[in-house]
């Protein structure tokens, strides 16, 4: 009988069914308070089953969907009388899914802090995933990569022991990683307010002195920092511009004073300068 929007079943002795009922080979499930399961999941003998709009337990194999006011929940019904798959992996159409203890498909969540599932349920494999603003890489088996260096599409990355990708961070004081994770190599990189040169193998250049790049001379200290402003080297004063390049063949205004620098960068001082005939 129907009451307050729910269906109930009363036996001949008057007691209300609150478990399961087999009618001509069709199984119906009831909640503990007596209402019949409709468009829902019910349990019987320690197993979960999907129940359709007619209240009958579905015996067809495949995905089953239940929509709530906030989300869509997916289940997988097995060929074993429609029992829902629980605590198990499912390989389907080239993707791997995980059905939890209650039969619900995992999505947007971790499993054993090792696997992570997309919004539509498939485990990430051979792919990057951003979780809570942190990037992780998952190998071909879907496991979070925690083995250090990773080469991916021509770039080198570093994954820490917890699997998080280094970004805007140093490794061993020698390597530095971009905001998107790639390691700097054969290029300038900025950490904080300081520029560094990174060699082809990614290590920071720490050879103190001059460095020629793209027809400009730069000066690096022993820690690899690119210097700006005044530099004193081998008895001569040089001036490094705000972007690092050495001034030469030009005037520089510094602290309200003008200075002129030779073709090789040294500052003129204590001598006459003839320039443009003057």
Locations of regions flagged by a protein language model:
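Extracellular adhesion/carbohydrate-binding repeat motifs centered on closely spaced tryptophans
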Residues: 1-278
């Amino acid at each position: 009988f129907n009451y307050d929007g729910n269906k109930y079943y009363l036996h001949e002795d008057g007691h209300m069914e609150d478990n399961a009922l087999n009618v001509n080979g069709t199984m119906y499930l009831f909640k503990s308070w007596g209402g019949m399961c409709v468009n829902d999941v019910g349990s019987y003998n320690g197993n979960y089953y999907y129940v359709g709009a007619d209240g009958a337990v579905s015996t067809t194999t495949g995905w089953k969907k239940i929509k709530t006011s906030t989300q869509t929940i997916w289940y997988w019904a097995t060929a074993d009388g429609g029992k829902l798959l629980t605590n198990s992996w499912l390989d389907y159409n080239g993707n791997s899914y995980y059905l939890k203890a209650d039969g619900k498909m995992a999505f947007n969540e971790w499993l054993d802090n090792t696997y992570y599932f997309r919004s539509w349920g498939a485990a990430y494999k051979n792919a990057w995933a951003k979780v809570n603003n942190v990037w992780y890489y998952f190998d071909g088996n879907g496991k979070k990569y925690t083995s250090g260096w990773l080469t991916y599409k021509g770039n080198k990355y570093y994954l820490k022991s917890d699997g998080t990708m280094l970004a805007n961070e140093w490794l061993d004081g020698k390597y530095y990683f971009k905001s998107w994770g790639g390691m700097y190599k054969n290029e300038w990189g900025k950490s904080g307010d300081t520029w560094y040169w990174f060699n082809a193998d990614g290590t920071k250049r720490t050879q103190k002195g001059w460095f020629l790049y793209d027809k400009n001379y730069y000066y690096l200290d022993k820690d690899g920092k690119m210097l700006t402003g005044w530099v004193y080297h081998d008895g001569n004063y040089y001036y490094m511009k705000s972007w690092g390049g050495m001034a030469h063949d030009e005037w520089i205004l510094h602290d309200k004073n003008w200075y002129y620098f030779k073709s090789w960068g040294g500052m003129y001082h204590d001598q006459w300068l003839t320039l443009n005939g003057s």
